[in-house]
């Protein structure tokens, strides 16, 4: 995310999308992430998420805030300079624009920062690949005629959780594992 200034002309990145929040801070949950021009990260989280944000966030300051749109007023206290966000929600972006009329919207700094992998990312990718390969093996052994996809999914999700993978329900994650179509589909 060091290239933010070059890419967007901004000093500060604000992550509201869960994938980018996680990538920026190590925390996956309901929160806003801020990366300032000095490379310091801050998480603004509601009361129920603060403890986990402190536990899971990597080198982050954690600030408690109310949930939802109220968190934007807390955000306003921390932003000085040119700001860029990854916000993909139209209503939230409109609210952000009211508070920060010159705020830019771009996912490019987040995407660019992911292009070059560091040692810890490579280690995580290798572990995830190994677990997914094992899950394909489980499918081959456990799948049988007449079985519902939801039954197979529960076996796979149990294995994934045992191996410290997590199901968030967000796109780009483990859920849904299964297509869930046809007469024996999960739906």
Language-model features: where?
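Short, well-ordered alpha-helical segments in soluble proteins
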Residues: 117-120, 129-147, 160-164, 183
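Solvent-exposed, non-transmembrane amphipathic alpha-helical segments
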Residues: 33-35, 41-44, 145, 152, ...
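Short catalytic-site patches enriched in acidic/histidine residues
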Residues: 21-27, 107-112, 116, 148-187
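Secondary-structure boundary/capping motif
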Residues: 80-82, 144, 180
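Short, structural beta-strand-to-alpha-helix junction motif
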Residues: 70-71, 91-92, 144, 148-152
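Alpha-helical structural signal in soluble globular domains
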Residues: 35-36, 95-99, 142, 155, ...
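A composition/biophysics-driven feature that prefers long, compositionally simple stretches
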Residues: 1-137
């Amino acid at each position: 995310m060091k290239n933010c200034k070059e890419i967007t002309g901004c000093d500060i990145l604000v992550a509201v999308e869960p994938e980018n929040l996680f990538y920026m801070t190590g925390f996956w949950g309901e929160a806003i992430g801020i990366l300032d021009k000095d490379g310091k990260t801050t998480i603004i989280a509601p009361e129920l998420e603060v403890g986990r944000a402190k536990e899971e966030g990597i080198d982050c300051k954690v600030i408690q805030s109310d949930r939802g749109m109220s968190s934007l007023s807390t955000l306003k206290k921390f932003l000085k300079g040119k700001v860029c966000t990854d916000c993909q929600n139209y209503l939230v972006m409109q609210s952000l624009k009211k508070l920060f009329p010159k705020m830019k919207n771009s996912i490019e700094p987040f995407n660019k920062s992911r292009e070059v992998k560091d040692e810890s990312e490579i280690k995580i990718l290798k572990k995830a690949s190994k677990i997914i390969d094992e899950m394909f093996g489980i499918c081959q052994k456990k799948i049988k005629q007449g079985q519902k996809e939801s039954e197979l999914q529960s076996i796979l999700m149990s294995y994934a959780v045992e191996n410290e993978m997590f199901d968030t329900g967000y796109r780009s994650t483990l859920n849904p594992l299964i297509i869930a179509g046809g007469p024996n589909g999960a739906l």
